[in-house]
Amino acid sequence: RLISEKHAVVAERGSVPVGFGTLDVPTGEILQLYVRPDYARHGVGTVIVDELVRVARAAGVRVVHCIASLNARAFYVTVGFDPGQRRKHRLRSGVEVDCVPMKKVLE
C-alpha cells in the first residue's frame, strides 16, 4: 500500500514527543497507539485518538477499529469504543497475546 493511505499523529509536550498513533485511512484501523509511560493518564492518548477519528470521519470512514491489548481495553471504552469478544492475536513475531477487538461507529 502507499504511505498516503496512512495517517500518523505525533503528540508533543514542548518539543518532546510523548506519544503517537497511526491510522490506515481506507480501512479505519488504528494500527498503533503509544504514549510514554510518564505521560499516561494525562490526556495524550485521548488527543491522539480524537485526531485519528477526525481524520477517519473526514475521509468518509464509518467505523474506526483496532485490536487492543487487555491493558488498553478500558482506555478505548472511555474514548467511545465498544469491545468485542476477547481472543488471541498473533503478532508479527509469531507470539500470541490476549486482546480485544474494539470499534467505534462514526455518526
Each predicted region: which residue ranges?
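C-terminal "cap" of GNAT-fold acetyltransferases
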Residues: 67-71, 79, 89-107
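Residue-level recognition of the GNAT/N-acetyltransferase active site
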Residues: 36, 40, 67-69
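Residues forming the Rossmann-fold NAD(P)(H) cofactor-binding site
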Residues: 42, 46, 50
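Conserved GNAT acetyl-CoA-binding A-motif
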Residues: 56-69
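Conserved hydrophobic/aromatic "anchor" residues
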Residues: 9, 20, 75-76, 81
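Acetyl-CoA-dependent GNAT
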Residues: 1-38, 49, 55, 106
